[in-house]
C-alpha cells in the first residue's frame, strides 16, 4: 500500500448505556482522525426489581441506524468503508433458535441480579467448599496457578454462569428446544456477529463464534487452558453445544451481509470493551496498568504472557490473542482485573439529586473547599468488590454536621471514587508484585481532574490521561487496523496515541490524603453487611 492510501474504519461500540459509532480516517502507518460520529441510547428494561434487560430487536435497529448515521456524518458512502471494528460490553447475553433466529428472551445484562440468591447459595454450598478444598490440595502438590485460582473461586452476579443457569431452569420454550440441540447462547458480540453475517434472512446458516476476550470473563471459561471449563459446564448443567466457537481477535470474521447496509463490509475485529480500552491506552507491555472509569471502574494490569492466579479478589483474563504472519505466530496477552461497579452511576445519582447541574462542575466544587469537613461517602450501590468483597454493603454519607455544605459532600463523593480505585491499585500490587510507574486512565469519569489528581496522590505515581478518553472505540479501531495491515506493529499505535494531561503526585498532599483514606476505610466498615441486618431488612 502507498503511504497516501486513505482508509476509513467504522468502529461500533455497544456499551451499557450507549451505542456509538465512530468513523476514523487514516493513511497507511498514519495518524487516525475521527471524521464522523453517531450515538444512540441503550434502552434498559427493568421488568422486576434487580432485573436489567435489553430488547434485542431494539438493539439491532439501533446498531444499524448508528452505523448509517456515523457514515453519513463522515460524508462517506458505505462502500468507502475499509472495515468494521466491534467492541461490546461483556457478560450480557441472550439465547436464540439456530433454525429460526428467534430469541428466547431479552439480553440479560451484566448488572442483572435475578440470580443473586443462586450466587449466594452456591458460594455458601458444600459443593463449592469441596471444590475449593480439592483445588487447594492439588495446588499444594503441583504449585499450579490454575489450582491456586480454583482454591479461592467465588461466583459473582456480573458473571454469566448463574444467570444462564437461571434461564435454563426457568424458560419453558428454551428448555423444550434444548432437547433438539437448536438453542444457541451468546453474549452481545456473538449475537451481533451472527446477525451481521446472516443478513436479512434470520434463518441463514452462519458460524456461531465469539471472540476470546468476551468469553474469558463469563465465569465458565478457563483462561489457563484457553477453553470452556468442563468442570463448570458439568456443575451448572450447561451443554457445550449451546456455546459458540471461541476465536482469536485476528480471526477471519467475514463480512457484514450486503442486504443490511447495501454493500459487503469486512469485519476486521471483535473485542470486549475492557480489552479494547487496553488497546486504546496502548498498555501493551508487561506491568502496564490502565483504569477505565465509566459506569463502573475496571483496573487492568498487563501480566504479559503469563496467566496469574489471584488470592485477593482480582481475576485473571485473556487480554487479547492474535495470530499473524505466514508462520501464524501467536501473540497472547493476559490481564489481572479488578472492578468497582459504581463510579459513573454515583456521579449520575449526584446529578439527579441536585448536587450539581453538570458533572463537569463537580471538580471545581470539590476544589473550592480545602477538605470535606470530615464528611465521608461510601459508594456501594452494587455492594463493594475487591478487596472488600461484600455484596451486602450499603451506601451513604457519614460525618455530616451543621457546618457541612454541598461542596463538602461533593468532595467526599469524588474522594470516595478515588479511594475505591486506589484500593484496587493496592490490591493489584499485592497480586502481581509489579512496580507500576504510571496509571493510564480513560472513560467519562477520567475527565474529572480532581479524581485524577487525588488518585495520583494516593498511589504516588503519575496518572496519564489520553487525548481521547473514549479509548474503547479507539482500541477496537487500532486492532482492526493492525489486522488489516494499515499498521504493521503495536509500536506504531503507541506512536500515534496522544497524551492530553499527566497528573504528578503532590507529595505534600499524599500523607494527608492517605490518612483520609484510612478514615474512609473505617467508614466502609460501618456500612459492611448492611443489608443482611434484620432491622434493616424489615424497613423494606
Task: Name the predicted role of every residue range.
Residues 18, 78-81, 241, 372, ...:
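Short secondary-structure junction motifs
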Residues 2-12, 23, 120-134, 141-142, ...:
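Active-site core segments that coordinate phosphate-bearing ligands/cofactors
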